[in-house]
């Protein structure tokens, strides 16, 4: 009969009383008690006992004693598996230090702890830091264990995957190309580790927009996943979804939708119609239909998906919010701008409640909402929303940040639509000063702003100033792009058009 945690706790208390906190029998009993707590899923209690026992162990032998290594390793692994990644990382870092002090910097215990620190950093979003550690561990394992040792290859794989997460896809692909033959030689082509590395190669090709190669790699990898993991395994569904995304990015819309439809059907059978994975594939399917320009069918799918997510999760769930956004974007694409604007407005209110007025997500949504209002011809309301978004963006990102600059530009353009030319001119002057600072005098952004500034001068009737701006702008466009470039011709065509008009030109924004 297996003793319960309650029984083991009583036994432990007796030993602590009789033999003392530092006795070996007490240590063993304490470990058994912790194991029972973990088995009974009493994780908070187990964490507290781990911490207490580790403190006693340090008191007995010293914090840097090798006698603390097994218990600290066990505690760190427990924290990691329990999802307490930050505290786990702290314990692994101390474990690495103690192991290096007692066993040496390239001892396997030290390298294992160091690698676990990197895993924790990865989970916490510090991918750059994790990549640096993975690189050091891989180098040490090559020196200590040899280049083809399984541990060395595993560390190499961790480093390769981490490179991809940092956005260094070219470097990640190069490592994949070198690593795959080693994996095949050591473990074989059908080993799950080899199969997973093929998936990483496909992802790197995908990220580098080498779509034909990526599609071929994905197709072969999917077959391997089905053989190795089975058609119903979550990892098989994941790689199939990545393949569908790659097809879509490669503009194979029909193939992408067909594959996503099959993926959705299989997910409903394997996981059920309301499983989060199924609902995500449903969202991808609805979006794919829109990419095929099947807007009405896409809207019907989004409508049903939104109703399902509202019923299951409520309006504040991230997946529900994501679907509302997708639905609104398709409405915009179908030229139902007023309907789209209503959904954007509702979405903004929901996100503000959860994240606050100046959260970056609110700024992004407010900008999208303003564009929808602009497309619907509601210029006054659009200018108000652009103004709110730009003020928040200035506070959050700063006056020279690209996101603030873009929103500010859209606000100025909307003022022109409202015939508020004097205000628009002031905004364009400020924008030009910032654009020259962050983009440069000869950048396309600066040239476009000078064009808008010139047109606004014409609209205000400041014809002499406008023609002066025009002459300099044509000279600069010719110098930067050449006489026959579309940008140069566009400016010249506007000048010719204005010169041929007697009356004041109409709204300068097309």
Task: For each feature predicted by the language model, list its residue ranges.
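Intrinsic-disorder-linked linear interaction elements in eukaryotic regulatory proteins
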Residues: 1-510
